[in-house]
Amino acid sequence: MEPRAADGCFLGDVGFWVERTPVHEAAQRGESLQLQQLIESGACVNQVTVDSITPLHAASLQGQARCVQLLLAAGAQVDARNIDGSTPLCDACASGSIECVKLLLSYGAKVNPPLYTASPLHEACMSGSSECVRLLIDVGANLEAHDCHFGTPLHVACAREHLDCVKVLLNAGANVNAAKLHETALHHAAKVKNVDLIEMLIEFGGNIYARDNRGKKPSDYTWSSSAPAKCFEYYEKTPLTLSQLCRVNLRKATGVRGLEKIAKLNIPPRLIDYLSYN
């Protein structure tokens, strides 16, 4: 039997499976006037395609903020799941649209939906939007959310070499030595051969001796005499200073939102800058 739209689909209801509707098309393309006309004529804003994509998913993935606003105002389900489990907030983060992310959050989108795959924070790290990453953390995103494919958001940001996102995560208290199959963010940094990333992770307490499920240290993924290899060699011969180790341990003690706590300490501004990695 051919999938068909539900008879009498009301705004706020999820319809039967259909192919992409005019509402999907208008939402994806950012045709806000056409979308508004469709909504006013009674078109269902929660109709799902065979892969469970709603018009709100389509608009969010393309960063069409005006269309997202129209759909939400018309009763679109803010936490609808597609076939992969992703919500519109995941898609908005994947697009890197801070405006869409703000709209969805204002309508109550869950920042930590129960997922085994990429969370909104993972998607923001994947897209490289440090602004989205910062906003999600501010509203309570789980820094250690685990994706069965990628690991933590920090793993994703390092694998994609998004240094701004990495620093936001680390400053917010992300576990620098979190592991997926014993593989840490430092292993990813070594694999992508990014010296700046390697140095940042080590400065935040990354364990250069951690071994993955193949028994390899991060340095084992570098070429002899290459810049990354020399970087690891330097830190093996020159461990972090006492002041650096104190900073790492104090940051661990402050935990999530550590920067906010450090800024309120009754200590000289120079020390606050040092503890904040400025």
Curated annotation (Swiss-Prot):
Q: Does the keyword Repeat apply?
A: yes
Q: Name one GO biological process term.
A: intracellular signal transduction
Pfam families reported for this sequence: Ank, Ank_2, SOCS_box
Which InterPro entries does the record cross-reference, listed alphabetically? Answer: Ankyrin-SOCS_box_domain, Ankyrin_rpt, Ankyrin_rpt-contain_sf, ASB13_SOCS, SOCS_box, SOCS_box-like_dom_sf
Q: What pathway is it annotated to?
A: Protein modification; protein ubiquitination
Q: Which residues form the signal peptide?
A: none
Q: What is this protein called?
A: Ankyrin repeat and SOCS box protein 13
Q: Which organism is it from?
A: Homo sapiens (Human)
